[in-house]
C-alpha cells in the first residue's frame, strides 16, 4: 500500500466521521425546525409527510432518499417528471416555502447517518434519468466512485436541472468536483449552501 493510498483512505474516513458528527449535531439542534416543517406538510397532506424515492448512490447501488413532501400525492402519476422552478403547479404552498429554503432536504440527514449520502457530493439521480444521461455522456459512471451529497458544487452553480442540457452541464460540474475535491472545496460548498438557505436565494 502506497503513501497515497493511505492518505486517500484516511481522507475518506475523516470525511465520513465529519458527516456523522455534523448530521447528529444538526438533528439535535434542528428538532424544533424539523417539527415545524413536519407540521407545515402535515396540515396540507392526507398522505405521508415524507417523500421517499429510489436514487442511485455509491458503486451504482440504489437507496431510498428521503425528503419532506413538497408536491401533491399524484405529482408523477404520468411518469417521471422534472421539477420546473416558478411554474410547477404540482407544488403545494408549504412545499414552495420548503423548497425556497431547501428545508425539504432536511430528512436526508438520516440518509447521511445511514451511509447512503454525504453532506457534499454529486446529487443522486434516478435510474430513469441516468440511463438517458449515459447515452449522451457515459462519464456519468465516474460519479459512482463517491457518495452522493445533500448539496453539491453543481447545485450551487447550475441550479435545478429541468432539461437534459442542464443535466449534462451539471455532470460537468460534478466531474470537476470529483477530480478536485478537497476539504477546502467542501467547506466552500457547505458554507455557501447554508448562506443561500438562510437568505432564500434560489440555487
Residue ranges of predicted features:
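Structural signature of FAD isoalloxazine-binding scaffolds in flavoprotein oxidoreductases
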Residues: 2
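A hydrophobic, helix-centered structural microdomain
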Residues: 5-74, 111, 183-203
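C-terminal terminal-structure detector
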Residues: 5-10, 141-203
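Acidic active-site catalytic centers that drive phospho-/nucleotidyl reactions
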Residues: 19, 104-105, 174, 186
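Positions in alpha-helical segments
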Residues: 23, 51, 92-96, 173
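Short, glycine-rich, amphipathic interfacial segments at transmembrane boundaries or analogous
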Residues: 51-90, 151-170
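A short, structured surface patch at a secondary-structure boundary
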Residues: 84-147, 190-193, 197
